[in-house]
């Protein structure tokens, strides 16, 4: 059995990366895919569930886990910590399951340094105006927070060229199709197919 592929997915807040990942998993229920549930010190938003959207923990606990080396990557964003469990990622990939990480460019850099075989995808909004409209439509943040997110968006977007793939989320269905195409192409690579069809290939090449 071949190992799963780790996908790093980044985007400015409001570009739709979480929605695209969720839609991908829902539309491919037979595929072995999971989303990594990060740890965070930020407060829980309406509609979120502990252990499903994030593992919500106190700052002191998070810093203890940092000292123990429990995170594959971690970063401080908007005054809150976010981190990814090292053990869970490695065990899940060993089972042949693809894992998706919804993280920012800082975390992506840390992941690539430690796991160079990971594939990375950057989601772009079609315009700054559309990005701001989406942030307002969520109804989750104050005007001040939205202004800060828009200010940070340019910095986040400036790192798009560090990624393997880039998707423009203008039309959601088209963006979702592009995302599925990336996963499909990765699964058709020679090394993956050789492992999956080892017996068939041996039979085809037998004298």
Swiss-Prot record:
Query: Where ATP is bound, by residue?
Result: 11-18
InterPro entries to which the protein is assigned, alphabetical: GK/Ca_channel_bsu, Guanylate_kin-like_dom, Guanylate_kinase, Guanylate_kinase_CS, P-loop_NTPase
Guanylate kinase-like domain boundaries: 4-184
Question: Its Gene Ontology molecular function terms?
Answer: ATP binding; guanylate kinase activity
A Pfam family that the UniProt record links to this protein: Guanylate_kin
Gene Ontology cellular component list: cytosol
EC numbers listed for it are 2.7.4.8
NCBIfam families assigned to the protein according to its UniProt record, in alphabetical order:
guanyl_kin (TIGR03263)
Name the family the entry cites.
Belongs to the guanylate kinase family.
Q: What is this protein called?
A: Guanylate kinase
- Protein encoded by which gene: gmk
């Amino acid at each position: 059995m071949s190992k799963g592929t780790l996908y790093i997915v980044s985007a400015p807040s409001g570009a739709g990366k979480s929605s695209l990942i969720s839609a991908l998993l829902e539309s491919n229920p037979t595929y072995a895919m999971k989303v990594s549930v990060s740890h965070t010190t930020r407060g829980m938003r309406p509609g979120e569930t502990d252990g499903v959207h994030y593992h919500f923990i106190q700052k002191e606990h998070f810093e203890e886990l940092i000292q123990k080396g429990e995170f594959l990557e971690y970063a401080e964003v908007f005054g809150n910590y976010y981190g990814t469990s090292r053990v869970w990622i490695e065990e899940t990939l060993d089972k042949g399951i693809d894992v998706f990480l919804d993280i920012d460019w800082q975390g992506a850099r840390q992941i690539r340094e430690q796991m160079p075989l990971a594939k990375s995808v950057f989601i772009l909004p079609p315009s700054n105006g559309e990005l701001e409209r989406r942030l307002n439509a969520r109804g989750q943040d104050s005007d001040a927070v939205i202004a800060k997110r828009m200010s940070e968006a340019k910095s986040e977007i400036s790192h798009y060229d560090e990624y393997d793939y880039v998707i423009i989320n203008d039309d959601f269905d088209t963006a979702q199709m592009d995302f599925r195409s990336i996963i499909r192409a990765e699964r058709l690579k020679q090394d993956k197919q050789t492992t999956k069809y080892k017996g068939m290939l041996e039979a085809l090449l037998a004298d």
